[in-house]
Amino acid sequence: AALVAALGVTCLGGCQAGSTGGDTAVNGKGVKIYVSLSQADAFCNTLIDAAKKTAEASGAEIVVYDAENSIENQVAQIKQAVAEDYDAIMCGPVDADTALELEALAGDIPIVFYNSCPDASVLEPDKYIYVGSDEGVAGQYQAEYILDQMSDKDEINVVLLKGPKNHSATKGRSEEFKNTLKASGKKINVVFEDNADWEQGIAEDYFDLFLQTGKQFDAVVCN
């Protein structure tokens, strides 16, 4: 989270940044950062709280708006950032596939994307960048845990409840999860798969629906 705010400042020309032992000192005096959240939740609120502290410590001004999971709202927010002369935009995209459109709207304002990664083809060093974890590794770890817990089984039946359909984390985790299981040489059956959008209630409804099928399962994975 701190790195996101720091990059939001250091994207701009004329700012000073130095690093020693992993700590980054950023001079953000006079810099205005506009944050467009895809949707406020506990995770994003934690990230933004840390980003605010980092921005304020550097002397930067930071404002945060919630797009409420609406592409239209996010487009309007980027337009607002341009109209109000913000220096940098931090954007958790509602749909990472809209990144190119958001960049076009932003014009000369640099964008730091976070949490959901746009395609590498629309990123550009020092102007349109992404800060986030390697989601494929998360999917790999999930698969490795299942394989470790079920090392005595030659066949594994899996229920897979995924995050939002258009989120890069969902895509990266799910793909590498399946690839790692496949590479194990075991017979892997995904007996149920759907997008629960990281919502407990939706996940419970889908799992109840699955149970009605009477199919056997060995593991339930939520990514």
Predicted regions and their residues:
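A residue-level marker of the well-folded mature domains of exported/periplasmic proteins
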Residues: A1, A5, G14-N223
